[in-house]
A protein has these predicted regions:
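Conserved C-terminal active-site "lid" loop/helix of NAD(P)H-dependent oxidoreductases
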Residues: 215-221, 240-281
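Catalytic helix-loop patch of NAD(P)-dependent Rossmann-fold dehydrogenases
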Residues: 78, 83-86, 93, 106-148, ...
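NAD(P)-dependent short-chain dehydrogenase/reductase
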Residues: 136-182, 188-189, 195
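Adenosine-cofactor binding site in Rossmann-like domains, unifying the SAM/SAH pocket
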Residues: 28-47
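NAD(P)H-binding glycine-rich loop region in Rossmannoid oxidoreductase-like domains
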Residues: 42-79
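SDR active-site strand-loop-helix element
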Residues: 7, 32, 57-61, 98-103, ...
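N-terminal Rossmann NAD(P)H-binding glycine-rich loop of SDR-like oxidoreductase domains
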Residues: 3-22
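Mid/C-terminal beta-alpha module of Rossmann-like enzyme folds, strongest
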Residues: 200-246
Length: 282
């Protein structure tokens, strides 16, 4: 039986990964979260990983609060950069594969067409900078790695979909940014891609998002449509949002990722974002 360590097991992706593997007797999932394993401590990581001797490590742990990363820079770099470095060192030492989840925020967000894996990152926020450093550490310390950049993730837990549905219960209308464009991605779809990659030797950096694109306001509109809500969506600009929340971190205006490498290695495709969102509501 192949053992797989999943960090951040209680998050959206961690839960989706567990569901993806739950009926496969070939794998044993070893779940960890911050209470069980502090990935920022190299001694604890090495001790844990060496004791388990896993086939693979799937790192779903991250500090994802974009505004929080601006305020707690040290914490952001510890979790998003030092943590992945420690896991990479441990994976290399034990011969394990490492799946590391990254983000569209490693790019500046000023492109006119989807970013491929061959475009050079240039993050503008502390969240993006810390995640980019994490990627570099993974590549430096672990040969058998899969770095998967994703975006606008939703699943079980706190996310944009749940936030919109909660607001719909309290308010007749909501204001949502219309000039930030990306690809909403279900944790279930991302977990399926991880499952596809992990048993291969196609190591490297990948983009993993649902197909097609929309604005946050379009996303909210589709959420309310599928939920049967009459909540009105007011389309506002990023400048409007910045005036409303002056201390918020800068967000990418265009962070659409092209899953180019997945197509190159075998034609794997994600569902389009509307189909995946519809399945989420079923």
């Amino acid at each position: 039986m192949k053992r797989i360590i999943v960090t951040g097991c209680n998050g959206q992706l961690g839960r989706a990964v567990n569901r993806e593997y739950e009926n496969n007797p070939e794998f044993e999932i070893i779940n960890t979260d911050v209470d069980k394993l502090d990935i920022t401590c190299i001694e604890k990581v090495l001790g844990f990983v060496e004791a388990v001797n896993p086939y693979a490590i799937i790192n779903c742990a991250a500090m994802t609060a974009v505004d929080g990363c601006e305020k707690e820079i040290d914490a952001a770099y510890k979790v998003n950069a030092v943590g992945p470095r420690n896991l990479a060192i441990a994976a290399e030492k034990t011969g394990a594969k490492l799946v590391h989840i990254s983000t569209d925020y490693v790019f500046a967000g000023d492109a006119k067409e989807p970013y491929t894996e061959f475009d050079e990152p240039s993050p503008v926020s502390m969240y993006g900078k810390s995640k980019w450093q994490g990627e570099k550490f993974v590549k430096e310390f672990c040969r058998k790695h899969f770095i998967i950049r994703t975006a606008w993730l939703y699943g079980e837990g706190k996310n944009f979909v749940r936030t919109m549905l909660s607001l719909a219960e309290k308010m007749p209308e909501v204001s949502v940014v219309c000039d930030q464009v990306g690809s909403p991605t279900s944790a279930k779809e991302l977990a399926k891609a991880i499952y596809y990659l992990i048993d291969t030797s196609n190591y490297g950096t990948y983009h993993g998002t649902c197909e097609d694109m929309c604005s946050w306001a379009d996303f909210a509109t589709e959420i309310f449509r599928l939920a049967g809500k009459s909540t009105k969506v007011n389309y506002i600009t990023s400048e409007d949002y910045a005036r409303m929340y002056p201390n918020s971190a800068k967000r990418p205006a265009y962070s659409v990722l092209d899953n180019y490498m997945l197509r190159l290695i075998g034609g794997y495709r994600f569902a389009d974002w509307k189909t995946a969102l519809s399945e989420y509501f079923d």
